[in-house]
Amino acid sequence: MGSSSLVISPRKLRSDVYSYSYENDSNTPLVISVLASLIERTMTRNERIAKNCTWPLSNKTRVFDCHEIPDMTIQSYLERIFRYTRAGPSVYVVAYVYIDRFCQANPGFRINSRNVHRLLITTIMVASKYVEDMNYRNSYFARVGGLGTMELNNLELDFLFLMGFKLHVNVSVFESYCCHLEREVSIGGGYHIEKTLRCAEEIKSRRCGERRFNQIARIMM
């Protein structure tokens, strides 16, 4: 899915959320890029603060920490989830609501590079179950997210208990989070989103080049 021709505007974001069509739209929905930009900036801020101070960490929320940090940008990871699960744009808005509720319910939790991927696949899967009529099994989401099925099952259960099973999102809450994402685009957010997209594309190109180089190297050996 090409992202280089993606139109970045509040109107485009709103249009994607309410009328995105897999058949007619070749680009990734804008909400994914906006969410990736927001999360990456949050991670950068959290990791900068972490260097200067320490905050109490709950052992309960450490279940989202991975042993090794995945070598994949947030943008690329969200695009992968979108490509293989076909979860609609509204799912990502609801996932954003859930992440916010989770952080409010667990003040000691901070999104960082070690926990963000597991948190995202879990929240998107839970949001998909809430929003969509038809869903893939947990085992499929686990493969897409790079986890074991039992691992994702446990993360889902932990997530639900840690946020107090507060899954209901009414229309006014949904609209307020859509408006927040729109403001992210209109108030200088476009630059950050374009930067996020460029970084993701550069990493993809570099990896493709490395794969081609390795294939050539194997042939020459």
List each model region and its residues.
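Acidic, Ser/Thr/Pro-rich regulatory low-complexity segments at or just upstream of the first helical elements
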Residues: M1-S90, R101-G108, S172-M221
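Non-catalytic, well-ordered alpha-helical scaffold segments
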Residues: P29-S33, P89, V93-Y96, H117-I121, ...
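Short helix-interrupting loop/turn segments at helix-coil junctions
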Residues: G88-Y92, A127-N135, V169
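Short conserved catalytic/interaction loops centered on acidic-Pro-aromatic/His motifs
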Residues: F109-R114, Y130-G145
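Channel- or pocket-lining gating/hinge segments that regulate access to a cavity or pore
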Residues: S139-E182, I187-G188
